[in-house]
Swiss-Prot record:
Reaction catalyzed: L-methionyl-[protein] + [thioredoxin]-disulfide + H2O = L-methionyl-(S)-S-oxide-[protein] + [thioredoxin]-dithiol; [thioredoxin]-disulfide + L-methionine + H2O = L-methionine (S)-S-oxide + [thioredoxin]-dithiol; L-methionyl-[protein] + [thioredoxin]-disulfide + H2O = L-methionyl-(R)-S-oxide-[protein] + [thioredoxin]-dithiol
One term of GO molecular function: L-methionine:thioredoxin-disulfide S-oxidoreductase activity
Name the UniProt record assigns to this protein: Peptide methionine sulfoxide reductase MsrA/MsrB
Cited function: Has an important function as a repair enzyme for proteins that have been inactivated by oxidation. Catalyzes the reversible oxidation-reduction of methionine sulfoxide in proteins to methionine.
EC number of the protein: 1.8.4.11, 1.8.4.12
Amino acid sequence: MKVLSYLKNFYLFLAIGAIMQASENMGSQHQKTDERVIYLAGGCFWGLEAYMERIYGVIDASSGYANGKTSSTNYEKLHESDHAESVKVIYDPKKISLDKLLRYYFKVVDPVSVNKQGNDVGRQYRTGIYYVNSADKEVIDHALKALQKEVKGKIAIEVEPLKNYVRAEEYHQDYLKKHPSGYCHIDLKKADEVIVDDDKYTKPSDEVLKKKLTKLQYEVTQNKHTEKPFENEYYNKEEEGIYVDITTGEPLFSSADKYDSGCGWPSFSKPINKDVVKYEDDESLNRKRIEVLSRIGKAHLGHVFNDGPKELGGLRYCINSAALRFIPLKDMEKEGYGEFIPYIKKGELKKYINDKKSH
């Protein structure tokens, strides 16, 4: 009886262990109801894991092997098992959609390259999107269709339901945190190039704008007037936060890129994203200038000049305060701009200013 009892317990232990291993290998660990998961392959997983962890809304990223021929593998056997180096991305759908997460992913992979990313060549370095929720397939297909319109050549990104997932060895987890100067084929700074969705903002009618805006705000944004220097709301504002289009609410500039140029108007080294502003030639005042307008609202913002700090790109966006609304860092989450908080906190401009002061 003791032997029988022992055998029962032994086999029960094996069964439980097998179930737990299968759960992990198939990527089906219990997720919280407010979490989602997607698996992304994009060459060496060291860089892709570190990159994904920098994206607002990503809860966790870890390295593993996906969609091979066998239920088990390791780093040394990938050429035999045909697994792809991949990153398991757990994210909060309230903070970032799958569509936007994929657009961040597309920024750091060559979508038409077959079995090669960066200097890494081989089947294990193929690109792929592997899903566990069948509803994600439609989102993935839509994102790839949009991407195909932007690139030359046929997209080579593999799209399949997740299978035979194996978590990578601990040595590979958080590799670039452990080895900051380690190999990485991805430019991690691309995570700071925030994506601003144009379908979230609309331009109000002229009637609405006249009611919503002050006389000065209306004249500046709609009739290209210029406010007085040194007598406007934001020219010397140093508080951390985001500057949005006064007419639409679309994010335009960040305190992280604001500096004192001495001109009397708010000055920025660049917009929060290159796509949120448009440019037109301006030959008024008998001189050539480049006018800056907002993307959605088409509001006049100011002008851009090439006399900015060379260390920050050499540009000076000279913008009217009346064209902007400032949202303090502490209020950004509740006002719907939480995804831009990491960008506001980055220290590129502060480091430049501190370096200038120390010399």
